């Protein structure tokens, strides 16, 4: 199975999302899935990642070699983001069904409230004073929590402020990420599992 992840900023987000999605694929019984990130076209921000014209371009370019398309964006406290993703999923699924005979699918997910929170969910030694519900609700969770944690770990000078290092650690505790992120990770895993089960 070939999985292509579409991100609003692959430069910073790739190192976080790749290990977590790979761990998710193992959890749903697809350990051999080849998971890659779309780098061409390079999307700049959630507006482009949620634009049908951009998504259609990606589906046309990579549809022949991809079974599962997965767009991951920050929620940023925007309650309408899920509705936009739902609309994108419908358009993409219709496009894939009409263009290809083999089963292909497209899912979208918005991280509450930023992708960095998925990483924090799997990390050990998060300051005990931090309340998880507050981390999940914070619109600027990247600056309010993730960057502070990366600084505590002396990772701000590392590539992408330590996102990759921390994500690799977090992915080893994927069960914890799933448990702490029911609105996004748990939901996405359930959708992927159901789709894989239908394939047989």
Language-model-detected regions and their locations in the chain:
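Short hydrophobic beta-strand that contains or immediately precedes a catalytic carboxylate
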Residues: 5-7
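C-terminal accessory helical subdomains adjacent to catalytic cores in phosphodiester-
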Residues: 1-3, 12-42, 49-200
């Amino acid at each position: 199975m070939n999985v292509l992840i579409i991100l609003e900023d692959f430069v910073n987000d790739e190192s976080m999302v790749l290990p977590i999605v790979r761990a998710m694929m193992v959890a749903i019984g697809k350990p051999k899935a080849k998971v890659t990130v779309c780098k061409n076209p390079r999307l700049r921000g959630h507006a482009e990642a949620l634009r049908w014209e951009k998504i259609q371009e990606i589906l046309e370019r990579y549809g022949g070699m991809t079974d599962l398309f997965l767009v991951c964006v920050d929620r940023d406290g925007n309650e309408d983001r899920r509705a936009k993703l739902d609309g994108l999923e419908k358009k993409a699924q219709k496009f894939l069904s009409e263009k290809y005979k083999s089963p292909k699918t497209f899912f979208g997910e918005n991280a509450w409230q930023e992708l960095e929170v998925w990483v924090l969910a799997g990390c050990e030694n998060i300051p005990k004073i931090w309340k998880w519900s507050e981390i999940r609700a914070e619109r600027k969770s990247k600056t309010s929590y993730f960057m502070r944690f990366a600084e505590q770990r002396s990772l701000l000078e590392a590539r992408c402020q330590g996102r990759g290092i921390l994500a690799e650690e977090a992915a080893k505790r994927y069960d914890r990420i799933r448990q702490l992120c029911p609105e996004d990770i748990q939901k996405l895993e359930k959708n992927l599992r159901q789709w894989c089960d239908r394939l047989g």
